[in-house]
A protein has these predicted regions:
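An extended, acidic, His-containing surface patch that forms the Zn2+-binding/catalytic region
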Residues: 6-110
Length: 110
């Protein structure tokens, strides 16, 4: 409707659709992420709503029946998906420590 107001000659055809994803913000897996990020970076994580349009996530969550959590490591100044996107070693190093901590904690729960 908005596009039609701007230019009535434009025709929009939807070729596909993905279901949106919304992660949980509490529970044992989220608590494990909090501890892992603290171990990797020395700070509490900031939970933000990003990545909800990654189509495979809804399918994975339904198939695996477990919470899907993202541990994004990029910072706003990294220009995520921009022409000059970069990722600094400090984030990579902290991220590796966080993931090792997270997977070790999950393994200990089994």
């Amino acid at each position: 409707k908005h596009v039609a107001k701007l230019n009535s000659e434009v025709k929009v055809e939807r070729e596909g659709m993905l279901h949106p994803f919304r992660s949980v913000f509490d529970g044992p897996y989220v608590d494990a992420v909090k501890r892992a990020v603290k171990a990797g970076f020395g700070k509490e994580p900031a939970f933000i709503r990003e990545g909800g349009s990654i189509g495979a996530v809804v399918t994975m969550q339904k198939a695996w029946k477990v919470p899907i959590l993202f541990m994004g490591l990029s910072l706003p100044e990294h220009g995520y998906h921009a022409p000059n996107e970069y990722f600094d070693w400090g984030q990579a190093s902290g991220g590796m420590k966080a993931f090792v901590h997270y997977f070790a904690e999950l393994a200990a729960k089994r």
